[in-house]
Amino acid sequence: MPKVALYNQNGENIGEIELNDAVFGIEPNKHVLFEAVIMQRASLRQGTHKTKNRAEVSGGGRKPWRQKGTGRARQGSIRSPQWRGGGVVFGPVPRSYSYKLPKKVRRLAIKSALSSKVLENSIVVLDNLTLEAPKTKEMVKILNNLSVDRKALIVTADANENVILSARNIPGVTVVTASGINVLDVLNHDKLVITKAAVEKVEEVLA
């Protein structure tokens, strides 16, 4: 089982914590990570693109000139696709790009992401993370104590409003709960700062 240092909010090493091999100690599967990131990014797409077809473009109800006798090619509407300003054939319509990978693949992806952070030595485990009031200054101090000076993902066991409000104005810092942890967030941040209680919750679900 991988062992990592356990810190308090002052940045002091107060011991070690054993992480579950099945969650934090597997060989990261790069292809599964790739598939999971593509899935998440697809779900974030708005899908609000839209073009008008010949029935929706304004105008064009009248035949532009008579069928025969002008010497020009026959035309039925100035809004047919070959005309400038005409309708678009088979253009994009609003749609959802979201899809889901199988549950086993999604679980393997998050375990691979967490294990990669352990291998990179980019995981910081806190014994507890509590703030008496929402103070950005206090959160910055805690992160400095832990030598976290880059993009960081903070994972708490449950939603903590003081922690969320204290971190929301810090560039590159994101707060999620153990139940909301996802591959894109883990890979998109340099450091993973996770509380001991959150570790236990993640292991309970994924082990």
UniProtKB/Swiss-Prot annotation:
InterPro entries reported in the protein's UniProt record: Ribosomal_uL4, Ribosomal_uL4-like, Ribosomal_uL4_dom_sf
Region of interest (Disordered), residue spans: 45-78
GO cellular component, one term: ribonucleoprotein complex
SUPFAM superfamilies in UniProt: Ribosomal protein L4
One GO-annotated biological process of the protein: translation
Keyword Iron annotated: no
One of the Pfam families matching this protein, by short name: Ribosomal_L4
Gene Ontology molecular function, alphabetical: rRNA binding; structural constituent of ribosome
Keyword tags: Ribonucleoprotein, Ribosomal protein, RNA-binding, rRNA-binding
NCBIfam families (UniProt xref): rplD_bact (TIGR03953)
Protein role: One of the primary rRNA binding proteins, this protein initially binds near the 5'-end of the 23S rRNA. It is important during the early stages of 50S assembly. It makes multiple contacts with different domains of the 23S rRNA in the assembled 50S subunit and ribosome. Forms part of the polypeptide exit tunnel.
Subunit structure: Part of the 50S ribosomal subunit.
Family under the similarity heading: Belongs to the universal ribosomal protein uL4 family.
Protein name: Large ribosomal subunit protein uL4
Gene coding for it: rplD
